[in-house]
A protein has these predicted regions:
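C-terminal accessory regions
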Residues: 237-320
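Residue-level signature of catalytic and energy-coupling elements of molecular machines
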Residues: 86, 112, 185, 217, ...
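Conserved helicase motor core of P-loop NTPases
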Residues: 2-7, 11-12, 114-234, 240-242, ...
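Cofactor-binding loop segments of dinucleotide-utilizing enzymes, especially the Rossmann-like FAD-
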Residues: 47, 112, 139, 184-186, ...
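Structural beta-sheet core signal
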Residues: 44, 109, 181-183, 287, ...
Length: 320
């Protein structure tokens, strides 16, 4: 590990890459500790709010560090000896340009080149890997371990898929297993929106009603970062509804923080998109693949890779 850290900090600009579970976030924390112990200043960032929370309480999104707002980026200089960017596979060229323009110290980009690029954007990571120094973490072991973790089941009808999905998630609920359902899309019969309402009726049919169609006990995901409340809530964080609080909804985030947000700042999260799951892992994952409805988009290589690698213990791919 010490030689890997040295390699990552040897150059002004470098990339740390590896597959799911290869230790990228752990290495990022080690780099932060090393630089701080030497008296240096670190700016820890990620491309998503959820990924930033995994780096520590003082981490933030890269967009916030650079002062992104309606008029563009307002920060011209970042006062740090080291800037870390986790989930760098989601970088766009313009954001990278603003980052390099503002930074005076070292920049370490951390990510998985096989993950999804931002919607509608050109993948930046693949090109950077050809020109910047690269530290690679345990990729072969990570890929090999996935072979025994992923089960693929094809269904002759949507009804059969939903019947089996009901059995699986009820089994997880009965045994207290942490799980997450994924779909590539929001719309359609097997999209996130419909599956969430369907799963709400299975997992929490009797929860007391709250604003916006939510129920006490529902699993939800934050859709808008809020730093202006007592305990921050960031886009992509998940939690559980505690009940209504005036015109807001009180929830306990998975981090343990309790916040109150408006209904429009939340979505049900029994099922989330593959894009939203990027940067997170769960004990068990059920990856619903609406192949007939979505065609090539649902089976695109990067989409499949991210969906299949979100489970720490096992992933069940359900294809129709």
């Amino acid at each position: 590990r010490s030689s890997v850290q040295a390699g990552a900090l040897r150059y002004r600009y470098s990339i740390v890459t590896g597959g799911a579970g290869s230790g990228k976030t752990e290495l990022a924390k080690s780099l932060m500790t090393q630089v701080r112990e030497q008296g240096g200043k670190v700016a820890a960032t990620a491309m998503t709010g959820k990924a930033a929370t995994l780096l520590g309480e003082d981490a933030t999104t890269l967009h916030k560090l650079l002062g992104y707002g309606g008029g563009g980026y307002s920060v011209s200089t970042v006062d740090a000896d080291l800037v870390l960017v986790d989930e760098a596979g989601m970088l766009t060229w313009h954001t990278l340009y603003r980052l390099l323009l503002a930074c005076r110290g070292q920049v370490v980009l951390i990510g998985d080149p096989q993950q999804l690029a931002p919607v509608g954007a050109t993948p930046v990571m693949a090109e950077l890997l050809t020109v910047l120094p690269v530290v690679r973490l345990g990729e072969e072991g990570s890929k090999g371990s996935l072979l025994v973790k992923v089960q693929v089941i094809r269904f002759a009808s949507e009804a059969l898929l939903l019947y089996q999905l009901r059995k699986i998630v009820r089994g997880y609920q009965d045994t207290g297993v942490e799980w997450q359902a994924l779909s590539p899309v929001y719309a359609g019969g097997l999209g996130v929106d419909r599956l969430n309402r369907w799963l709400q009726e299975i997992m929490n049919p009797d929860g007391p009603p709250c604003h916006g169609g939510f129920r006490t006990g529902d699993r939800v995901i934050v859709t808008k970062t809020r730093y202006d409340i007592g305990q921050r809530a960031v886009n992509g964080e998940q939690g559980r509804v505690l009940g209504s609080m005036g015109d807001t909804i009180a929830l306990r985030l998975d981090s343990g923080r309790e916040v109150a947000l408006r209904a429009e700042e939340l979505r049900l999260s029994y099922c989330i998109t593959v894009h939203k799951a990027q940067g997170s892992r769960y004990e068990r994952v059920v990856f619903i693949i609406p192949e007939r409805e979505c065609g090539a988009f649902a089976v695109e290589e990067r989409m499949q890779y991210v969906g299949r690698t979100r489970g720490r213990e096992a992933t069940v791919c359900m294809v129709y």
